[in-house]
Design a protein with these regions (language model features):
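Ligand-binding cleft/hinge of the Venus flytrap
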Residues: 62-64, 78-87, 166-185, 213-217
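Short loop->beta-strand "edge-of-pocket" segments that line small-molecule binding or catalytic clefts
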Residues: 51-54, 150-166
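Flexible hinge/capping segments at coil-to-helix
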Residues: 30-36, 40-42, 140-157
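Bacterial lipoprotein signal-peptidase II cleavage site
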Residues: 21-31
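Extracytoplasmic small-molecule ligand-binding "clamshell" domains
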Residues: 34-114
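Alpha-to-beta junction loops
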Residues: 87-88, 105-113, 157, 195-208
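A ligand-binding cleft/hinge motif common to bilobed small-molecule-binding domains
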Residues: 98, 115-123, 169-172, 200-217
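Acidic, polar ligand-binding/catalytic clefts
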Residues: 83, 88-152
Length: 217
């Protein structure tokens, strides 16, 4: 499988998304009760619990292990903050499209799921300082060759997950209503479709794509 960054790489930064507060930078974030994958750090003396929503389909940031528990870089980072700050963490795995609505409704306190900081999101939620810089990259199906942005534009079908930064990148390349963009509900579905040749390529976060390629060579 071949991974290629296009010429005008879109840089995004992962951060925590927090419910917007008056007078601070704003943003929207969602999360609800865990359907699977709920877990928590050991309880501190204070007993304060921070409800953290994740879409555990973004290895190495967050994914589900064999026991359906959430694991990954974001989990380790949040647990380290909880230990230092003296609070407990309740992780909740939810579909991506439910994360920001749940945050806005107060069902969770934080969304931590490799969230890209955008101007639109800052209008409805607050963000932490960025803790990881991510590029959007093109994952190319077997037998396809992509050397530059013009090669990407020449592809017949390019996958992206609805609402992800890769979707926004695809819209910049092809147009928001272009039939070239094949949208998927989840990242695993898109990655599998690229692998099977159902689409010519897919656009997603560099760290996630690199992890997928490493484990599927």
């Amino acid at each position: 499988m071949f991974v290629n960054k296009w010429l005008s790489t879109i840089v995004s930064c992962a951060a925590l998304a927090l419910t917007a507060c008056g007078g601070q930078s704003s943003g929207t974030a969602p999360a609800a009760n865990a359907e699977v994958g709920g877990s928590s750090a050991s309880a501190p003396a204070s007993g304060k619990v921070l409800r953290v929503a994740m879409n555990a389909e973004f290895a190495p940031f967050e994914s589900l292990d064999a026991q359906q528990k959430i694991e990954g870089f974001d989990v380790d980072l949040m647990n380290a903050m909880a230990k230092a700050g003296g609070f407990q963490v309740e992780f909740q795995h939810k579909p991506w499209d439910s994360l920001f609505p749940a945050l806005a409704q107060g069902d969770v306190d934080v969304v931590m799921s490799a969230v890209t900081i955008t101007d639109d999101r800052k209008e409805t939620m607050d963000f932490s300082e960025p803790y990881y810089q991510i590029n959007q990259v093109v994952l190319v199906a077997p037998g396809k060759k992509v050397a530059n942005i013009n090669d990407v534009r020449a592809l017949s079908k390019v996958g992206a997950v609805t609402g992800h930064t890769g979707d926004f990148a695809a819209q910049k390349i092809f147009g928001a209503t272009s039939e070239t963009i094949a949208r998927f509900k989840t990242l695993p579905l898109m990655l599998k479709e690229v692998e099977n040749g159902g689409v010519d390529a897919g656009i997603s976060d560099s760290a996630v794509v690199a992890n997928y390629v490493k484990n599927n060579e």
